[in-house]
Amino acid sequence: MNKTLLSLMLLLLPLSSFGQYVRGDVNGSRTVDIADVTALISKVLSSGGAYVQVCDVNYDGAVNIADVTELIHYVLSGVWITPDYTGPSIPENAEIYTVNGVSFAMLPVEGGTFMMGYGDTEYAYPGSHASHQVTLSSFKIGVTEVTQELWLAVMGTNPSPDQSDVSLLPVCSVSWHDCKNFIDRLNELTGLNFNFPTDAQWEFAARGGTLSQGYLFAGSDNIDEVAWWADENATSWTWHPAFVGLKKANELGLYDMSGNVSEWCYDDDWIVNNSNVAPMIDPVYERASVPNEALRRRIMRGGSRYDEDAFGWEFCTVYSRDRVRVYDNHKLFGLRLAIWP
């Protein structure tokens, strides 16, 4: 066969895609060909242009020569070196909910007693609780962060900067009040009682609940096994969310509770500074009123890929907390759903 004709046939091979995402379509033409290779090489050499997940064709969280190699291989052979990623494995005991044609998984979490906050040998990151005993009733929590696809199904809009794959990217650039509106609308559509996780529920789930192995991060002591995060060498090319569920799950089967996007919790700004407090049962803190809602702060958990400094890992520990104004909507703020007792 003529080599030129063979090359043209290879460039027209079926595309790997899910939703609106076309893997390897760097230039947005809806086809994958040599022009995408050229565009990707340009991005790698210059670090120019806004990052989108479509540039990370091998799903390793970086955009570099390895992605160029993989894309060239696909253009020439029609086969990806790294298999297509279509979503995480869902625990067998998860419950599936559907709204406007979009399904998502919630995991029942058996209640129990645990020590919440940082221990005696752990770094006391500002804003974190001192260690204290908490007992929780059973609840349910999202297996993954809320995706853009689910947000779109509920709200009809998508505030996220990178919308290259709405089915697998977490929604981001959302304030606490944006998320509250989303939850209220979701409850109207389903007749159920979804909510944010409480501060204590979030930490218990991140630690692995009654199956906890005592890890520093959600599922491992090795942050790279379970979290997309940033250090002092981070650049704007790493300040973006990754597909949900690419990293290892924690003991319960929950993904990305360390890193990726920071997750809003229900509680108002509060902190336990002294370990000598009475044991707590199902704690949740909400002020009855505040003088200025714009200055109100709610708890945020998990860290993200934007938390870049020499101690960026610290933001991603199971006990680390932040207190953020309720109308702030940073590009790596997201959420995870819960259902309370």
Language-model regions, residue ranges each:
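Cellulosome-associated attachment modules in secreted, modular CAZymes
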Residues: 5-86, 159-163
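Residues that flank catalytic or metal-binding motifs in active/ligand-binding sites
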Residues: 22, 53, 102-105, 110, ...
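Bulky hydrophobic/aromatic "packing anchor" residues in well-ordered structure
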Residues: 26, 109, 114-116, 141, ...
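Acidic glycine-/aspartate-rich tracts in secreted/extracellular proteins
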Residues: 45-49, 77, 112, 119-121, ...
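GGW-centered surface loops in extracellular recognition modules
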Residues: 85-111, 115
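Short aromatic-cysteine micro-motif
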Residues: 101-102, 124-210, 233-256, 341
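Surface-exposed recognition segments
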Residues: 122-132, 210, 257-341
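Active-site Gly/Thr loop motif
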Residues: 219-252, 301-333
